[in-house]
Amino acid sequence: MSNAATGSRVLYLGSDQGLMRDLTALVEPKSVQLVQLGSASALAQELRRLAPEVVILDAAAVSVEGGLAAFLGTLYGGEAFHPRAICIARAGSGEDRMEQRLAALRAGAASYLVPPISVKRLASRVLRMCGIVETVRYRILILEQDASHAKKIASLLATIGMETLVVDDPMKILARMQAFRPNLVLMDLYLPGATGSELTTIIRDHDDFYGIPILFLSQEADLDKQLAALKAGGDGFIKKPVSREALIAAVEYRMRMSRWLQDRRTLVNRRETAGGFLPRDVFMRHLEQITRAREAQGGVHGLVIIDVDGSQGILNALGLTATEKLLRELESLLSKTMTPEESATRMDDFRYGLLAKRETLSKLEALASTLCQQLSGLKPQDRDIKLEVSVSVGVGLFDPPADDAFAMVSRAEKAAAGAKSAGGNQAHVWSAASRQNGAPEAESVIKRLVSTALAQDGFLLFFQPILSLNQQEDELYEAQIRMKTLDGEQMPPAEFLSVAERAEMMPRIDRWVLRRAFEVMHAERVAHPRLRLLVHQNVMTLAAPEWFPWFRDQIIKRNLTQIYPVLELQMADVRQNRAEAKVFIERLRKYGIQVCVANVTGIREEISLLARIGATLAKLAFQTIRNADRIQLTEIVQALQARGVAVIAAGIDDQATVSRVWTCRPDFIQGNYLQLPQPELSFDFQHMSHDG
């Protein structure tokens, strides 16, 4: 692959002068030469002479029978050198079908584009194939009185493409930040006229800079003074004299995390389109908030699931591109039926969710019927293809109150499944008849449900990501159990675990959860090689003599050596059975198996106990996260970390909480603000680890 500095060549076979002009303007400044050719013979000749990095083939310029795929096969057939090929299909020719894409891919194409062509995206693709990475320069403000030290830091940051501004007067910090708009601030902890802690307090009080990462440059070894600086809002320390490795690692990670939080804040507050579509995770979080509110808000709310009938047949008939165009038209029609208060999302490839509100139940049912009629009138753009489109619509009602967002999805999906099994192209409304007007299930009924679930594999695991703030690359999820009920809903653990405990069923449930966790870890070991699961257990389950041999056998049977779950215990359980907990935790640690204790309030007795029994992680109680101020929370985090216990701040459900918790420097954060629990491992840890 040629380097941009020595020049890269791209050959274009085609006659679109506008494309040639616009593409040249975008790639020439990157030292890429674009050569236009008018015939296949000229291309074959120049291919040998110029050895280009990329060839762009316009189907309109190819007259070979078999199209682009056949031409590529001929072009590459006798050549040892194969540049990467971008194929452009002809508009309205039917060349956007899956068959043509597959044929081109198998003949050697690296990319297959269908008009209309975005020249900017094409240019970006060409540059990547030429080995030219387009980078964004991030800005770092350095507040340092020592000019030579500041210059050294600026030079080190320049080597990784950072733009820097050195400031030596702390009194000018806000003015310089307003003008420079940095992505991160590096400042000396001790400055003439003001300390770094004081300046950080002022910066955090400024609306524009509240969330900007601030790292201190210091030789300060006094833990109390470090703590005071962190309490003021600092994000961390870089020890003087600064080493290149420590500087770059700290800066890149803090900026990456800051950008993620800014992206998340933007995502939560935006609409994908003017039609009221939301990203799926934002939609689910909004649904969760409405579900938990449980107060009458006027009108009748419902979750509407729209499931396209015969989806595989549509995909086979139209191909991927035409199918997506059809679904875009469906989305447009759906948005026209929505009021400004309503929102929708694409749940998966062929299912949509609509959070609807109408004045009465009959009007909500009428909406579902209207959706069936309107969406069933969709036709593919290619009128020669005879295709009937229909949808099955299911409406899940909020009355009686559901436990969470996924219970609501279960209601709507059950109704949609009923509509589909009845022949499709119709709407069904979820019935609450089996729930006795919302009355809670009797304990005897729940006990029978648990027994049935144990006998018939009636439990589910959902997974919620736990995000490291300390540059760990593991993918850590908490595995959360749910139970399927007779009416198709999913019962959260709070509703059945206490009953199971009184019925002495917890050892069997604990084993089911661990066994299922092992199955997931084994199945996902290739796709998620750094996966770790946090798995709930009870002290007395683990203390039983037969438990450890069973646990070891599960690991050996699935060849999961060195791939262990993290076992999670409840603080109240540990306090009640501290002697047993200490014994088996010590045994587990010898094998490298970690233990997390949850619902830690942060009182001195708990912190001391966690250190004595050898727990490696502590998950703070929700009420501690909600009620403690930033200084109190920081002191709890620091006290645990000083004893070798890493801290998980859970219950991060909104921007205000994440902003407050962020500066307290826990090791991990978890909550619905990151992602609601999902039935699959879908959080983008890779983006978090390597975006930068």
Curated annotation (Swiss-Prot):
This is Uncharacterized 76.5 kDa protein in phbC 3'region. Residues 299-432 form the GGDEF domain. Coiled coil: none annotated. It comes from the Bacteria. Transmembrane segments: none annotated. InterPro entries: CheY-like_superfamily, Cyclic-di-GMP_PDE-like, EAL_dom, EAL_sf, GGDEF_dom, Nucleotide_cyclase, Rev_trsase/Diguanyl_cyclase, Sig_transdc_resp-reg_receiver. PROSITE patterns: EAL, GGDEF, RESPONSE_REGULATORY. PANTHER family: CYCLIC DI-GMP PHOSPHODIESTERASE PDEB, CYCLIC DI-GMP PHOSPHODIESTERASE PDEF. One of its GO terms (molecular function) is cyclic-guanylate-specific phosphodiesterase activity.
